[in-house]
């Protein structure tokens, strides 16, 4: 082989190597995106399941068992949100409700929406492992439900946040939690 042919062979190897690296990088990005999408779908399901559980509870401790409240000042004050007594305390992993089978203590111990304030849960997924779930409950303005209310109202905003290392990451490579919000509304049809 003369020197001209050697340069062509070396050039072909350079082009082939560059092409191989680009294809590999593309495959890695595609599989990462696929895993992020799958983890996000699982996070959606986990968050919605928790939200459904919460919104199926009574609006407030004071409205349990069919008791009617006519004045929002009769509702639980924000500083009393969370578990009401030791019988409602989660005794799991350091106060974190943990289950591999979806049998969480909150389902039998909590009886109203604001019991979930500060609640933490770990949900098992066979493909991704543990998802961390946290809940925040707060009163909101009845006319503008995006605004917090410093007093008691007949509206409570429930936020469910799900975290997992496989969720989508921002430009700083930080995990972006999946968050859903909904309103619990005390119906005043009386």
Model-derived features with residue positions:
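Aliphatic-rich helix starts adjacent to a transmembrane/signal segment
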Residues: 3-48
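Low-complexity, Gly/Pro-rich coil/beta segments used as flexible assembly/activation regions
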Residues: 45, 51-190
